[in-house]
Amino acid sequence: MIIGITGGSGCGKTTLLQTIETRGGLILDCDAIYHRLLATDAAMLSAIEARFPGTVEDGVLQRKKLGAIVFADEQALLELNRITHGAVKKEVLCQLPTQPMLAAIDAIGLFEGELAALCDVTVAVTAPMEDRVQRLMARDGITEE
């Protein structure tokens, strides 16, 4: 069974994922996969550079340059997501077990990245905003301000 898990920061996704993992489930953390691909996937970086010239220098993504472009232009962000979501989905497909077993895909863009289609069931983890704020403050060592 493949479970797709999504939800906002501080909702409890990590707790759910830890429970699945302790029961022998495979956890596919799409954020970690994305960051690994930024360091290893030359094809993805090449596609980003082709669409957003000057954002990859010596094989390294220049996050500030790219962020300045995509966060100022919704269409540019959609195009970046198309590139990166495709690469992440490809990697998830490579890591999914060929034999039936419990696996969970943890992805903020579960639906946007078309990963939900790989799942037998999807779960949106939610929590009251007050609880989320308290959890984030405790986790990150920050104040509410």
List each language-model region with its residue ranges.
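Hydrophobic anchor at the beta1->P-loop junction of P-loop NTPases
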Residues: I3-I5
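ATP-dependent small-molecule kinase phosphotransfer cores
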Residues: A32-M101
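Walker A/P-loop
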Residues: T14
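ATP-binding Walker
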Residues: C11
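ATP-dependent NMP and nucleoside kinases share a basic, alpha-helical "lid"
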Residues: L93-P97, L102-A138
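Post-Walker A helix-loop "phosphate-sensing" segment adjacent to the P-loop in P-loop NTPases
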Residues: E21-C30, A42-A43
